[in-house]
Amino acid sequence: KRGFLDVVKHIGKAALGAVTHLINQGEQ
């Protein structure tokens, strides 16, 4: 189950990075 949590954390970081990237591009 620890592996599952690692996957969730990894997906969360990737999603957060993608959203931040889109917001930054939208502001430019």
Curated annotation (Swiss-Prot):
Modified residues (Glutamine amide): Q25
Predominant localisation class: secreted
Organ and tissue specificity: Expressed by the skin glands.
One GO term of the biological process aspect: defense response to fungus
Signal sequence bounds: none
Keywords: Amidation, Amphibian defense peptide, Antibiotic, Antimicrobial, Cleavage on pair of basic residues, Fungicide, Hemagglutinin, Secreted
Gene Ontology cellular component list: extracellular region
Key word Acetylation present: no
Annotated propeptide span(s): 27-28
Compartment(s) of residence: Secreted
Domain of life, source organism: Eukaryota
Recorded coiled-coil stretches: none
Role according to the record: Has antimicrobial activity against Gram-negative bacterium E.coli (MIC=13.32 uM), against Gram-positive bacterium S.aureus (MIC=13.32 uM) and against fungus C.albicans (MIC=13.32 uM). At higher concentrations also has a bactericidal and fungicidal effect. Has hemagglutinating activity against horse erythrocytes.
Family label: Belongs to the frog skin active peptide (FSAP) family. Cruzioseptin subfamily.
Name by which UniProt lists this protein: Cruzioseptin-3
